[in-house]
Amino acid sequence: KNEFIRF
């Protein structure tokens, strides 16, 4: 899981 784009 990639949690980079969290807006």
From Swiss-Prot:
Gene Ontology biological process terms in this record: neuropeptide signaling pathway
Transmembrane domains' residue ranges: none
Places the protein is found: Secreted
Broad class of where this protein is predominantly found: secreted
Sequence positions bearing Phenylalanine amide: 7
GO annotation, cellular component aspect: extracellular region
Expression by tissue: Found in the nerve cords and a variety of ganglia particularly in the anterior regions.
UniProt keywords, alphabetically: Amidation, Neuropeptide, Secreted
Function: Potent modulator of inhibitory motorneurons. Reduces the input resistance and blocks slow oscillatory potentials in these cells.
Entry similarity comment: Belongs to the FARP (FMRFamide related peptide) family.
Name of the protein in its database record: FMRFamide-like neuropeptide AF1
Organism: Ascaris suum
